[in-house]
Amino acid sequence: MRCSWELLSLVLLASACSRFMGDQEKVDLPIRQDIKVDPADPTAQKIVGAADAFLRSLSDQQRKAVLFAFNDNSQRAKWSNFPNGIFPRSGLKRGDLNAQQNAALDQLLATVLSDKGVRNTRLQMAADDALKASESGGGGPSPNFGSANYYVSFLGMPSTEHPWMFQFGGHHLAINATFAGPRASFSPMLTGGQPLTVNYGGQKTYITKEELDAARSFLASLDPQQKAAAVRGNAAIQLVLGPGEYGTTIAPEGVRGSSLQEQQKQLLLNVIQARVDQFNARDANATMTEVRREIGDTYFGWWGPEQPFGAAYYRVTGPHIVLEYSPQKLGNGDLTEHAHNMYRDPTNDYGSAWLKAR
């Protein structure tokens, strides 16, 4: 009877989530055979070194489980907002690693991401531990919530001489980092969490506070005409470029960067940087350099109320960037405690600008 109840609960949760999250990602990315990789820089060497150290910490069986062919598009697309009980991952589960292996994985994450990015992954996993505790506390089944249910995988062997990909994720988190020598693409990247208020390191922390503060400051800087262009609706909407939207392009909406004063442009850049700063310094700087160059063609749109804090959807759309912040009602109905957030460069998902066969 309990098995039937658990199965029914997972089906009901999957059905509810699907109304909020869209389809599973499908990737059609034929890989070129003549990819030229520029000489590696110190960041690339450091990342590959950390990846090699993690792989050396594994048994032969574990290495077999964590490594996939670089052209494996099924694995490339294997990320989701769903917990693992609804959307099974492949690779190695964090909870199955020993202390030494987890330390090596943490070191790898610390090279791929910034300190801010590492902190975000830890906060999101802490939120999932809290969600697991709240779900199991009522006696019902849990669809594999918790920090043990986050997975690591590689497409291709880490190398400074040929492209490869690193994946880490689970419920509400997907890091998809494609590397080719000194270049990297972090698109697509899913962040967010539930609950967003967590106790971490002895302090109560709101996971997305920095990016929400930046968005609110930008919105407050707009004059009435600019604000009329920015505000697109009075209720939060769902992700537009979430899982299942590989290859999708969207028309920009909202107030255009070229209509902003210089101080307002900087405030818009702050919105973008709050998310992009989760990348390591090299790749965050490269992304922001491109964003600054194109800020006049970058748009900001807002859907929802200004209060309460965190209850509105917003989107930044530029030639090479789309950022989304999407509050969710699923759970206890509090929009401010559950968010699905996306970063994409639709021109370079999974490094397709360099890798795709023409």
For each predicted feature, which ranges?
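C-terminal motif of bacterial Sec signal peptides marking the signal peptidase cleavage site
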Residues: 14-16
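A cross-kingdom marker for long, charged
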Residues: 20-60, 64-358
